Swiss-Prot record:
InterPro entries associated with the record: KCNMA1_auxiliary, Leu-rich_rpt, Leu-rich_rpt_typical-subtyp, LRR_dom_sf, LRRNT
One protein family per Pfam: LRR_8
Signal sequence residues: 1-23
Principal location listed in the UniProt entry: membrane
Membrane topology recorded in Swiss-Prot or TrEMBL: Single-pass membrane protein
Keywords: Cell membrane, Disulfide bond, Glycoprotein, Ion channel, Ion transport, Leucine-rich repeat, Membrane, Repeat, Signal, Transmembrane, Transmembrane helix, Transport
Record note on domains: The transmembrane domain is necessary for interaction with KCNMA1.
Organism: Homo sapiens (Human)
Post-translational modification: N-glycosylated.
Tissue: Mainly expressed in testis and skeletal muscle.
Ranges occupied by LRR repeats: 54-75, 78-99, 102-123, 126-148, 151-172
Stated name of the protein: Leucine-rich repeat-containing protein 52
Disulphide bond pairs: C26-C32, C30-C39, C188-C214, C190-C236
């Protein structure tokens, strides 16, 4: 699924125009050298302005930044390396990285991310390494979040709040070599089955295999998520527990009761129908007998009249 095809000419024209204004200054308290800007540990609360437009490597780690403005970040069209580790970023908006389509390395670990939309990384087709570990409030990922990051080789999802993951989320990552999934509260219930089977079928073995374990259900607590495929298949597809047997028993009883009632109603209807037909036949016979008797009396009356007529003459 292609969510975006890169920045259009309008964005590039806008970036060029802004570049004429911005110049090539260096942010206060930051170090700028050879297309590299280092603002590590400067207690910044906002994204720094005056970053040279030819910057290729930008270090914003160990600060207090809460957001990444797409308008300013998008001016760095040559940026290939962005480190935002250990800040206070809560969310990255749709198309936050629309102007940095050359980005190869992105570190958003140890922040306060709560959600990532399917469009956040939509233009980062060149991205090779992505780290979003240590975001404990990140509870879910959309199945198309990584749809366009087809060059990704390294993905770190450790220590987030992820409880399950749609198998489609990793389906497009055919070049992925390193995957970290440990430290997450994986709920290995029936909704987790598709992802567990996906890990087996596509040989998607996390680099921290033995540490990426289930926290639920009790039967699978501590099991590596790469090894719960078969147990889950048994529990969710082929295995019947006592609730299933009770359900089947109730279904059988309902079918039996419904059949019995239906048979009884059929019998009652048949008896009523036969009684109705019998009464109708008796009435028809009585009516026929009455007609015969009337006809006989009329015939006798006419015969008597014919016999008496000559005597009167």
């Amino acid at each position: 699924m292609s969510l975006a095809s890169g920045p259009g000419p309008g964005w590039l024209l806008f970036s060029f125009g802004m570049g004429l204004v911005s110049g090539s200054k260096c942010p206060n308290n930051c170090l700028c050298q050879a297309q590299e800007v280092i603002c590590t540990g400067k207690q910044l609360t906002e994204y720094p302005l005056d970053i040279p437009l030819n910057t290729r490597r930008l270090f914003l780690n160990e600060n207090r930044i809460t957001s990444l403005p797409a308008m300013h970040l998008g001016l760095l069209s040559d940026l290939v390396y962005l480190d935002c580790q250990n800040n206070r970023i809560r969310e990255v908006m749709d198309y936050t990285f629309i102007g940095v389509f050359k980005l190869i390395y992105l570190d958003l670990s140890s922040n306060n991310l709560t959600s990532i939309s399917p469009f956040t990384f939509s233009v980062l087709s060149n991205l090779v390494q992505l780290n979003i570990a240590n975001n404990p409030h990140l509870l879910s990922l959309h199945k198309f979040t990584f749809a366009n990051t087809t060059s990704l080789r390294y993905l770190d999802l450790r220590n987030t709040g992820l409880q399950t993951l749609d198998s489609a989320a990793l389906y497009h990552l055919t070049t992925l070599e390193t995957l970290f999934l440990s430290g997450n509260p994986w709920k290995c219930n029936c909704s987790f089955l598709d992802f567990a089977i996906f890990l087996i079928v596509f040989h998607m073995d996390p680099s921290d295999d033995l540490n990426a374990t289930c926290v639920e259900p009790t039967e699978l607590t501590g099991w590596p998520i790469t090894r719960v495929g078969n147990p889950l298949r048994y529990m969710c597809i082929t295995h019947l527990d006592h609730k299933d047997y009770i359900f089947l028993l109730l279904i059988g009883f309902c079918i039996f009761a419904a059949g019995t009632v239906a048979a009884w109603l059929t019998g009652v209807c048949a008896v009523l129908y036969q009684n109705t037909r019998h009464k109708s036949s008796e009435e028809d016979e009585d009516e026929a007998g009455t007609r015969v008797e009337v006809s006989r009396r009329i015939f006798q009356t006419q015969t008597s009249s014919v016999q008496e007529f000559p005597q009167l003459i």
